Amino acid sequence: MTSPSPSGNVVVVGTDGTSSVSDRWPPQKTWISPPRVPIDRHFVTAAVPHVLMFLLVCIVFTAQQTRISTLEKRIDQLVVQIDQLPSSDSNTDDDDVAKSRRVRNSCMCPAGPPGERGPVGPPGLRGSPGWPGLPGLPAPYYRRPRVPLSNNLDESISRKMRAFGMLYSPDGQAIQLRGMPGPPGPAGPKGLRGYPGFPGPIGLDGPRGLPGTPGSKGDRGERGPLGPPGFPGPKGDRGVMTGPYVGPHAGPGPMSHHTNMGNVLPGPPGPPGPPGPAGRDGRHGLKGDRGLPGFDGESKIGPKGETGSPGRDGIPGARGPPGERGEKGDTAFLSTYPRVASSSTASSPGPPGPPGPPGVCHASQCTGIQGPPGEPGRTIIGPQGPPGEKGERGERGEPGDRGLPGAAGAANLLNGGKALVGPPGPPGRDGRPGDKGEKGEQGLRGDMGLPGPEGTPGKRGRRGRHGISLVAPNGTINEDLKKLLKTELMPLLIEDISELRGKNVIPGPPGPPGPRGHHGPVGPSGERGPQGLPGHSGERGDRGDIGPPGLPGQPGAGEISGSQSGPRGPPGLPGPPGEKGDLGPPGLPGQPGSLGLPGPPGPMGLRGPHGTEGETGKQGPEGSKGYPGPMGPQGPPGNDGEPGIDGRPGPAGEKGDQGIPGLDAPCPTGPDGLPLPYCSWKPMDGKNDVWERRKRASLPGAQPGKGAETRPPVTD
């Protein structure tokens, strides 16, 4: 029931007594929405992974069952073809029985009319092989002689069997299925060290450091600029009038000002005028007074440290050049020193004289080396002359060669004993490190080490990328793959095989079969092959099932009267079997199978050998000579050293007077009554020979460090 409303809407009253307002007529039917069921989100999130896993398992199981059923069909077809082949051990009785059956079942009636074309049969067998592949490389070993196949198996059938993964014996009596792949072989040797990887990413920023110590209080700043003008002050008090008030209307008019200016008194100041315009910014103020001194800050200078350990002794300075030779002393007299009365021994040298003046100090070392002793003078040894005056400082000479050790000290020579060996000096400073030597040659590869422990299995690898298909979508061989094989794979294979030919290589056992590759895309249907030869007639099979009813036969020969049809005639005899049809085109290849699960990772390889110790690197270049250090303080005088080797001979002295030959002189005399030269007490030719000097020094009565030069006895 409806009733109009004042607003133009229609009030709809339902059969159940409910009323509603609608702006249309007839009112639209309201659909009753089903009640909402609350859904638990946690339940949904927990159930979705399980449902997806169940669907995935179902899909995998269905795919496996499909593959198994497809293989079973193919095997059944192969079994049928094998059964159709003639058997060599067939008996003649079976042939007779088959012949009788054919005669019995043959129809003697005339052939009926040809029947209609039957339905399309099932897809045929696999087509002929495709295009021949690229020529393979020759094997590095001798090929085994090929066993001729039996006549029982056709070449095409055997090829198909091999394509399906079956093997057959050479005599054709046994068919073997390919077994399951064996376990993975042992891991190969460890490969070479790879190239260094890419540099890693920049590391994260380190933690924030601790806050530093607060700084000291700064100096007081300069005085700031002058501030803006202040607000106007409050209104002042009213002033006090001291004279008569003259208002604005007090005078008679403006003429009074001109007539008598002296009698008019100024009035009080008026009210403040309006504020004037803002003034300009003032100048900067003067610098303020200096602030009070700040507090003392924390001292950054720590306490005085402890006394350090004493430093090492300085390196001894270089040896200085020899000093200048002094002037020759005065001739000595016999009255100064006692004479030697013995005629069997040579005269001994006199006591040492007083020390001479210090030598000239050079920049490198103030103490000069001791000069070599001069040759003996006259027999009469005079006293030491007075020291000469100090000469002027000469120019610095070039450093000479290292001299031989000097003679022993005077004190030890007088006592006749050997000099004491002084204590060893302090160790010298460590030398500067030399420059870095050149990089040594790479060491030889070490022997193979012991096998390490078996490692834990690695993680599952990532799924590989899809490879390049051998067959292009148009049914031909992929051109990119051809180019890849010719340009990259073929040169590598030829090089490896050429290397193998040059060596006595024994082929190893065949490796385990690799994983099954991806199925290529579906190729186009090949051309129809030529019709095959008729096969051998097989044995009679079992009775088949009852076939479908045949087609209606032709009308009988009876007359038809009126519109009535005659009785139905008996069914006609079956016609003879038709000729075998042509071989159908090859069926399309099946769908590619799903990728198999990756196999378990192989065991960890053996531990590689330890490398041998590398060769010693080449010696680096000798470092540059250091600069001479500053001259250290003069050390204490050391003990007298051992007598050294004789120094170089000094300059030749003045020739002495000829002595009187001895009474026991073995030398012959010359025409002048004197001994021949180079005889008796005169020096020998081997004076400068070291061996000769040592020999003369070993004679009794010889002076240490001097040659065994005999002198004639001194007589009165």
Swiss-Prot record:
Residues 85-122, 183-472, 503-716 are annotated as: Disordered. Glycans are attached at N474. Residues 402-422 have a biased composition (Low complexity). GO terms for biological process: axon guidance. GO terms for cellular component: collagen trimer; collagen type IV trimer; extracellular matrix; extracellular space; neuromuscular junction; plasma membrane. Residues 280-290, 389-401, 429-444 have a biased composition (Basic and acidic residues). The keyword Cell cycle does not apply. Residues 266-277, 349-358, 568-577 have a biased composition (Pro residues). One of its GO terms (molecular function) is extracellular matrix structural constituent conferring tensile strength. Residues 179-238, 265-298, 302-330, 385-411, 422-467, 507-557, 566-603, 605-664 are annotated as: Triple-helical region. Keywords: Collagen, Cuticle, Disulfide bond, Glycoprotein, Repeat, Signal. Nematode cuticles are composed largely of collagen-like proteins. The cuticle functions both as an exoskeleton and as a barrier to protect the worm from its environment. Belongs to the cuticular collagen family. PANTHER family: COLLAGEN ALPHA, CUTICLE COLLAGEN 99-RELATED. Collagen polypeptide chains are complexed within the cuticle by disulfide bonds and other types of covalent cross-links. This is Putative cuticle collagen 99.
